[in-house]
């Protein structure tokens, strides 16, 4: 059993008969009253996000996990299929296990958390950002750059993101995977 002082981002815990991954936390010590920890918990089974507050010293059940590198193979409409790069075993995951499934392109290597108790995959840790090619966007209008105007663009995986007006079809852009937002254009 762990306590609230052990809480950190990425920690997997069992709470209310489900397994959650801590995505955000904040230790709060008010001037009056006991300390507590505010957390955002993401269910690894349903994908739902839960805001929860633990009082200081509260005992939590930590889930032991291992990390393994997997290569994304393909998506068949219902499942995303991955192959372990060490022993070539394949697993399939539902969309709930992936934070931003439309940002993974075929052949990309990601880290998957696996529960050591039952060897079940829990979640996929994406890289901080990915580089994708813009396949469709409207042309930018000259003289419309006085403000930070954006336009929608579709990238090679089908994900839609708002980009600045100077981005054209065929450009490679970097997208932050945690929020799914445009970061920068990649020059070749």
Curated annotation (Swiss-Prot):
Its main location: cytoplasm. Keywords: Cytoplasm, Elongation factor, Protein biosynthesis. Pathway: Protein biosynthesis; polypeptide chain elongation. InterPro entries: Elong-fact-P_C (IPR015365), NA-bd_OB-fold (IPR012340), Rib_uL2_dom2 (IPR014722), Transl_elong_fac_P/YeiP (IPR020599), Transl_elong_KOW-like (IPR013185), Transl_elong_P/YeiP_cen (IPR001059), Transl_elong_P/YeiP_CS (IPR013852), Transl_elongation_fac_P (IPR011768). Transmembrane segments: none annotated. One of its GO terms (molecular function) is translation elongation factor activity. Disulfide bonds: none annotated. It comes from the Bacteria. One of its GO terms (cellular component) is cytoplasm. Belongs to the elongation factor P family. HAMAP family: EF_P. This is Elongation factor P.
């Amino acid at each position: 059993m762990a306590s609230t002082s052990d809480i950190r981002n990425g920690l997997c815990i069992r709470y209310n008969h489900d397994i959650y991954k801590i995505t955000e936390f904040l230790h709060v010590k008010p001037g009056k009253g006991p300390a507590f920890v505010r957390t955002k918990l993401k269910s690894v089974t349903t994908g739902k996000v839960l805001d929860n507050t633990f009082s200081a010293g509260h005992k939590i059940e930590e889930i032991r996990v291992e990390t393994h590198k997997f290569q994304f193979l393909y998506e068949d409409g219902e499942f995303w299929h991955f192959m372990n790069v060490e022993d070539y075993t394949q697993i399939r995951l539902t969309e709930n296990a992936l934070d931003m499934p439309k940002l993974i392109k075929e052949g990309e290597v990601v880290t998957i958390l696996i529960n050591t108790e039952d060897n079940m995959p829990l979640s996929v840790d994406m890289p901080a950002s990915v580089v994708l090619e813009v396949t469709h966007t409207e042309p930018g209008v000259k003289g419309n750059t006085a403000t930070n105007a954006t336009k929608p663009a579709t990238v090679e995986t089908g994900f839609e993101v708002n980009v600045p007006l100077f981005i054209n079809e065929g450009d490679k852009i970097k997208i932050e995977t945690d929020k799914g937002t445009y970061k920068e254009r990649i020059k070749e």
